[in-house]
Structures are given as structure tokens and as C-alpha cells.
Regions:
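Active-site beta-strand/loop microenvironment that shapes enzyme catalytic pockets
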Residues: 1-34
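Flexible, D/E/H-enriched segments
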Residues: 21-102
Length: 102
């Protein structure tokens, strides 16, 4: 960075929360579609794609991650960081994604 200081930014949030009809938010197929869209955005290093999602789509998917990923998108626009997708799992009613940017 401009100051020559190492900096860390951590965006922590779960993906869609409507993967399981027995979960607290019920089931909506949009959760799976949202998670797949986010996975593609991370894999292609193009979080700007998230700006194309509609409010209805986001609300139906019930993610915690949307705003944090937009902030990360802003950070990535100002840096030359590239990502590594570490893991995506959906072990319960919500999806989880871990990516490292260096």
C-alpha cells in the first residue's frame, strides 16, 4: 500500500440462508442460485458481478454476505490482490465460502 504497511481486511459472512426447509428461514431455491453466482464471481475474481443482482433475488436468498462482499469488491478495485477459493460447503441451512486474497 502507499504507506508501505501490511494490512489485513477480513470480510466474514455466510451465503444464502434458505437451503433447508427445516432451517430457521425455510427453503428457497434462490439460496442455491445465489451461492452458485457468488462462487462464480469469486472464481473469476469479478465481485463486480454482484452489482447486477436484484434486491428481490438477494432478499429471497437471505445471505449475510452481500454487503461485506461489496466492500471487498471496493478493496479489490484499489489493490492488486488475487484470490484463491479455499472451500465452499453447505453443511446446514446456510452456505459457507472461504477465499484468500493475496
Amino acid at each position: 500500500n502507499e504507506l508501505g504497511v501490511r494490512t489485513a481486511f477480513i470480510a466474514s459472512a455466510d451465503q444464502g440462508h434458505a437451503h433447508d426447509p427445516n432451517g430457521p428461514y425455510g427453503y428457497d431455491e434462490t439460496s442455491k442460485a445465489f451461492d452458485e453466482y457468488v462462487l462464480d464471481a469469486v472464481k473469476s475474481n469479478n465481485l463486480g458481478k454482484l452489482l447486477e443482482l436484484t434486491q428481490d433475488f438477494i432478499e429471497r436468498a437471505k445471505p449475510d454476505s452481500f454487503w461485506q462482499m461489496l466492500i471487498l469488491h471496493g478493496v479489490l478495485k484499489k489493490t492488486k490482490l488475487r484470490n484463491t477459493l479455499n472451500v465452499y460447503e453447505c453443511p446446514t441451512y446456510f452456505g459457507m465460502l472461504v477465499a484468500t486474497y493475496e
